[in-house]
Amino acid sequence: MAKADKATAVAEIAEKFKEATAAVVTEYRGLTVSNLAELRRSLGNSTTYTVAKNTLVKRAAVEAGVEGLDDMFAGPTAIAFINGEPVDAAKAIKKFAKDNKALIVKGGYMDGRALTVGEVERIADLESREVLLSKLAGAMKAKQSQAAALFVAPASQVARLAAALQEKKAAGDSAESAA
């Protein structure tokens, strides 16, 4: 690879690091071209799966200000640059790795820090952002109705108490008039 080509490749990878919301580093040894194509399809349009030389990726990471990934760049390495929802892409990678034992997740990068394999798997186990937001909205709505019931309860209890006292007084008055 010519020096100019290397510089271009480093710049492209650095740009992908800068634009991505997250990245997952994998080892693809043993996967066929058709396996890689299937993985790319499963990741969707918001994720770019890039195979590159480790030395170029290391330089690009330094250029992009990404730290803590150097240990992951050994052996045949490919990076999934995620521009959309990290949970969806992590789920797709985890599912593909389960079906294809040759794909090994080495770690990742999100929110300015390196992620371990366990952290990437925990992200994959999360529910999607939309599901979490709908659960939060449901919980907030339920809490509001509970709070409204709590504020209304004392007034209804006072009304029932007043009605009971009125009935008792009426029963007492009718007993006195009968005597």
UniProtKB/Swiss-Prot annotation:
Domain of life of the organism encoding this protein: Bacteria
UniProt keyword Ribonucleoprotein, yes or no: yes
One example of a Gene Ontology biological process annotation: translation
GO annotation, cellular component aspect: large ribosomal subunit
SUPFAM superfamilies per the UniProt record, alphabetical: Ribosomal protein L10-like
InterPro entries to which the protein is assigned, alphabetical: Ribosomal_uL10, Ribosomal_uL10-like_sf, Ribosomal_uL10_bac, Ribosomal_uL10_bac_type, Ribosomal_uL10_CS_bac
GO molecular function, one term: structural constituent of ribosome
Keywords: Ribonucleoprotein, Ribosomal protein, RNA-binding, rRNA-binding
Pfam families listed in its UniProt record: Ribosomal_L10
Subunit structure: Part of the ribosomal stalk of the 50S ribosomal subunit. The N-terminus interacts with L11 and the large rRNA to form the base of the stalk. The C-terminus forms an elongated spine to which L12 dimers bind in a sequential fashion forming a multimeric L10(L12)X complex.
Family statement drawn from the similarity comment of this UniProt entry: Belongs to the universal ribosomal protein uL10 family.
Function summary: Forms part of the ribosomal stalk, playing a central role in the interaction of the ribosome with GTP-bound translation factors.
NCBIfam families recorded: PRK00099.1-1
Protein's UniProt name: Large ribosomal subunit protein uL10
Organism name: Mycolicibacterium vanbaalenii (strain DSM 7251 / JCM 13017 / BCRC 16820 / KCTC 9966 / NRRL B-24157 / PYR-1)
